[in-house]
Amino acid sequence: MKNMIALTGIGYDIHRFAEVPRPLMLGGVHIPSSRGLDGHSDADVLCHAIADALLGAAGLPDIGYWFPPGDPSCKDIPSLDIVAKAVSLIRERGGRIVNVDSSLIAESPRISPYLEQMKGALGAALGISPVRVGIKATTNEQLGALGRREGIAAFAVAAILMPEDLTMP
């Protein structure tokens, strides 16, 4: 068996609310809201932050490299597919996901009623138990663009195990 090394990565994403009607997706779950987020994909900030955390932990390029914003094939794709791609890239290199932890920052809508559903969707995409998926929701205390309800942001941290020989110079 190969020696494995624990690695961590951090991800962040922010999207403004769309000017045109579209669904609000967070953590792969449709959240009832009068406003969705603007973006090339489904604009799921939580999935994007988690994918970037995973890619960063593995020392791989960020999601913009794998899913360029101007690429028509990426238009409106489900962001759980972006998470699945990050997981696939890690597994192709002999790695595995240990856990993720994240925070959503939004004044509205109220997110807490959907946290368990998000953990289930993300756990399935990550190939881990939902108990290893942390999601917290907080506000920006009415400060800045997020406080003015102009958008939603997310931070995420991911822990992965990778073969040690892949991490050596």
Curated annotation (Swiss-Prot):
Pfam families: YgbB. The record marks H40, T139 as: Transition state stabilizer. Binds 1 divalent metal cation per subunit. Its EC number is 4.6.1.12. Its cofactor is a divalent metal cation. One of its GO terms (molecular function) is metal ion binding. Keywords: Isoprene biosynthesis, Lyase, Metal-binding. It is an enzyme of class 4 (lyase). It catalyses: 4-CDP-2-C-methyl-D-erythritol 2-phosphate = 2-C-methyl-D-erythritol 2,4-cyclic diphosphate + CMP. InterPro entries: MECDP_synthase, MECDP_synthase_CS, MECDP_synthase_sf. GO terms for biological process: isopentenyl diphosphate biosynthetic process, methylerythritol 4-phosphate pathway; terpenoid biosynthetic process. 4-CDP-2-C-methyl-D-erythritol 2-phosphate binds at D13, I14, H15, H40, S41, D62, I63, G64, T138, T139, N140, E141, R148. Homotrimer. Belongs to the IspF family. Involved in the biosynthesis of isopentenyl diphosphate (IPP) and dimethylallyl diphosphate (DMAPP), two major building blocks of isoprenoid compounds. Catalyzes the conversion of 4-diphosphocytidyl-2-C-methyl-D-erythritol 2-phosphate (CDP-ME2P) to 2-C-methyl-D-erythritol 2,4-cyclodiphosphate (ME-CPP) with a corresponding release of cytidine 5-monophosphate (CMP). This is 2-C-methyl-D-erythritol 2,4-cyclodiphosphate synthase. It comes from Akkermansia muciniphila (strain ATCC BAA-835 / DSM 22959 / JCM 33894 / BCRC 81048 / CCUG 64013 / CIP 107961 / Muc). The lineage of its organism: Bacteria, Pseudomonadati, Verrucomicrobiota, Verrucomicrobiia, Verrucomicrobiales.
